[in-house]
Amino acid sequence: MRLILCLPVLVVVLLMVLEGPAPAQGAPAIASTFRNIPNSLKEFGNNLKDAFESIPEATQKLMTSFAEGLKNFRIPMV
């Protein structure tokens, strides 16, 4: 019974393997790629700048919440 159930799966896998690799997608024109590099670098720089500018604020929030947690921390008496 298992053989009857496995045969269709094996046939599908065999057909997929024999089909071969998918054809490559057409590459965009190299000139348009070079034209987009400055914009991509500028966007990356802006994202990096925003990320670094948010570090002090996030650190301050973390330290504040940590200090609040320490204020409320009590060692249980046994």
UniProtKB/Swiss-Prot annotation:
Disulfide bonds: none annotated. One of its GO terms (molecular function) is fatty acid binding. One of its GO terms (biological process) is negative regulation of very-low-density lipoprotein particle clearance. Coiled coil: none annotated. It comes from Acinonyx jubatus. It is found in: Secreted. GO terms for cellular component: high-density lipoprotein particle; very-low-density lipoprotein particle. This is Apolipoprotein C-I. The gene is APOC1. InterPro entries: ApoC-I (IPR006781). Residues 1-26 form the signal peptide. Belongs to the apolipoprotein C1 family. Keywords: Lipid transport, Secreted, Signal, Transport, VLDL. Its main location: secreted.
